[in-house]
Amino acid sequence: SSIYSITVNPSPIVQFSSADQTICSGAATTAVNLSTTTVAANISWTCTVLPGITGAATNGTSVIPVQTLINTTNSPITLNYIATATTTGSAACPGNTATYSITVNPTPMVSANPALQTICSGASTSISLASLVSGTTFSWTFATSGSITGASNGNGNLISQALINSSFDPQ
């Protein structure tokens, strides 16, 4: 009779140093360190860059680096970084994949309708604000202009303010 020795390597599990991230377009992500529950393991990751995103890294090893991501669309885009750990040694055992996500929200562009408005003193403005980015909220501030009164900071998608010109000149 013979005695055989069999070594069973544990299946490595990838762990991420921080929770998934959500950023605004043009902002930098934070670096994410990848580790594993198994001491002797190599970690690699890949990311498929989706249309509408620039600045994304596509592959690496133990760190998802700082990236300045730009979303050129009007909708949020989520990048998924798929990581795998593989034990080292004579029996290299891959673990299950783990996914880390970074969502990049678009930069809303504001349109005003009408873009230019002329009113009589005492009349109200009626300027509608819109954006193609769903969920956009609007706020505005005003700059004091000579003898115009009635303007105020505000928020919402309609600027409606009764403005008074106490001078004899258009302003």
Kindly give the residue locations of the regions a language model identified.
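Extracellular low-complexity Ser/Thr/Asn/Gly-rich intrinsically disordered segments
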Residues: 1-171
